């Protein structure tokens, strides 16, 4: 899509929000550490892009050319890991994209998922454990972007692979 460059950050945030609201995985992947194809260190702008993707609570970050044909693939992965880990520590809950629960919905799974995530902030809960045959329950829990991990017990390997991209699901 061709858009003026100054609109890209706003459009990215809108698209991330739409994916979260639709309970779809969000992957940010465009030139995250592009300069590390030829240089051992990223630019400050690249570092900020990675941190912002974490602050927006995306499900996954992805490298491409940096690891496919770059001169510093291991360094690129280590760099992204360090930046993401620090951003996870620094993120502020008040900046989260909140998902409202549709009051007119009869979706019991979404209702229970929202309440479970809310409970983690009020009770001494450090994880949410769920079984997940199709992945739907775990994805609902992930969509509400809780502070603590969702431990999904899966019955099918395919479900486990699909959930690997979901925010906070282990």
Where are these regions (language model features)?
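Helical hairpin unit composed of two closely spaced alpha helices linked by a short loop
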Residues: 3-31, 35, 146-147
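C-terminal helical cap(s) of enzyme catalytic domains, especially alpha/beta-barrels
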Residues: 12, 67-90
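Long, charged amphipathic helices and adjacent flexible linkers at domain junctions
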Residues: 21, 79-117
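Flexible, glycine/charged-enriched surface loops at secondary-structure junctions
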Residues: 29, 64, 70, 89-99, ...
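Catalytic cores of alpha/beta
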Residues: 34-56
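Nucleotide-binding motor/catalytic cores of P-loop/tubulin-like NTPases across gene-expression machines
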Residues: 139, 145-170
């Amino acid at each position: 899509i061709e858009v003026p460059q100054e609109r890209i950050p706003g459009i990215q945030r809108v698209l991330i929000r739409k994916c979260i609201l639709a309970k779809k995985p969000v992957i940010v992947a465009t030139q995250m550490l592009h300069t590390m194809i030829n240089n051992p260190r990223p630019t400050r702008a690249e570092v900020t892009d990675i941190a912002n993707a974490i602050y927006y609570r995306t499900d996954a970050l992805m490298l491409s050319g940096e690891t496919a044909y770059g001169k510093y693939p291991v360094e690129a992965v280590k760099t992204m890991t360090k930046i993401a880990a620090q951003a996870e520590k620094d993120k502020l809950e008040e900046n989260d994209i909140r998902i409202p629960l549709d009051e007119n919905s009869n979706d019991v799974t979404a209702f229970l998922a929202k309440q479970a995530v809310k409970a983690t902030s009020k009770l001494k809960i450090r994880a949410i454990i769920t079984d997940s045959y199709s992945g739907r329950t775990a994805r609902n829990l992930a969509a509400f972007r809780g502070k603590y991990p969702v431990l999904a017990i899966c019955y099918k390997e395919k479900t486990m692979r699909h959930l690997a991209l979901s925010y906070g699901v282990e």
